[in-house]
């Protein structure tokens, strides 16, 4: 498990560190190489950074509540992966989605 030692201001989820590799293994088997993934409730943004690094052909669309995008944007900037798209503001409790 790698912690962002060079970027101490990025949020880190220990659960994400534990599960990102097994999730990537399953996604690699199940998704087309150029799949589009909408992640609902992206949290820290770690999954998006990890998945776009390990599955370089995919487009990963993170989403999160307004006010919780800073960490996702930080991970996006750090990862510099083309497939890591800018996060959408999404509240699944609302009737209207972007």
Question: Where do the language-model regions lie?
Answer:
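Class I SAM-dependent methyltransferase Rossmann-like catalytic core
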Residues: 2-33
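Short alpha-helical
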Residues: 18, 46, 67
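Conserved class I S-adenosyl-L-methionine
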Residues: 34-43
């Amino acid at each position: 498990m790698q912690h962002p030692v060079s970027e101490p201001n990025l949020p880190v989820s220990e659960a994400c560190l534990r599960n990102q590799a097994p999730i990537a293994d399953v996604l690699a088997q199940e998704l087309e190489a150029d799949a589009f993934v909408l992640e609902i409730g992206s949290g820290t943004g770690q999954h998006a950074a990890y998945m776009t690094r390990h599955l370089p052909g995919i487009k990963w669309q993170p989403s999160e509540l307004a006010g919780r995008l800073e960490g996702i944007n930080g991970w996006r900037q750090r990862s510099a992966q083309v497939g890591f798209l800018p996060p959408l503001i999404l509240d699944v409790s609302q009737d209207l989605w972007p």
